[in-house]
């Protein structure tokens, strides 16, 4: 944020705190330009009038060296023409000062999300990526097909999946692919907000509604008008609020906390949970009528351990991005690391893989990620699950004896199927090297081709 008035900068920082973003404030144009030598921001909020140069001067300097960095101008009423001119030279948007909290939050939130999507698309060039996802496994292809089919509808979508599988990325993909893609995408985490505040976060409040409500405030429902409202960890919502949410879904209207007036909005509902929603209904923690209202199009995200060779594809994409961001030179993984990544169960899913790679890239140097660089438990001996021993006690006739090569072929095919096509992982369970399996598969394919000829 480039703002020379300290009180205004502090106020705007407080407005943006709920977004959970890191905000760096500088007071001059020169400081703003110099700061780019140390860190490239995801967004620049730029005051048009600065003590040492104009905002236009800063705009030209930033765009000359970092053309992809989005800039939003903050301007008083009298300089709107200049702000419009700035947009012609690369500014993404402008805000009129004094700026309301909700307007600032929505503008900044949308700008950062758009910039993040463009960055992800660029970083994933050449990879099998889809709307922020990376991976081409069969299970993810099914996810992509569901998103393509359901995005244009207004029907509610219920995303399920373990923590770290990318449920918010999925919700953003649905929004981006829908007719509402240019409208707000507002996310609210029902598990992260205290019970006594979540109604205000969802529906907003009026001045004096409760202690500390000094001004009127828009809630997520109103901010999402025309766009998508994403309710993350919905099964954590209190039953009383579930009743009000059901009424909102049925009528499209709601009341702010402390108000008797009804407000009407048009939103598309996408929700997510890491639990089994029907089990939550059966155990009385989730309303059955709300379940039927929202569970119109179910979409399940597979855990990373079931996504086959997507693991390495994602790892390489993250490695390239993180190495660039941290100023490192990593370009590849050693074969033992690749084998370990394929063998590992990844209980924390993609989020855990991100954290592992961030740890490795920040704390180490070089071009190749090796086993010694991995944090626990990945750098520890891999404990294989004990295999089930076949029962050889029963006598069989000679007619039941299967050729050894066919027994081997069936065992390998079953292992590959059980590991969702992940050959390195299947090799780990079979206690052979991946190259052995690749070689045998190739030999069997060649044999079949000769028989056909």
Swiss-Prot record:
Positions where 4-aspartylphosphate occurs in the chain: 47
The Response regulatory domain, residue ranges: 1-112
Annotated ATP binding sites: 161-168, 224-233
Domain Sigma-54 factor interaction: 133-362
Protein name per the record: Regulatory protein LuxO
Keywords associated with the record: ATP-binding, DNA-binding, Nucleotide-binding, Phosphoprotein, Repressor, Transcription, Transcription regulation, Two-component regulatory system
UniProt xrefs under SMART domains: AAA, REC
Function in brief: Involved in the regulation of different processes depending on the cell density. Acts together with sigma-54 to repress, perhaps indirectly, some genes.
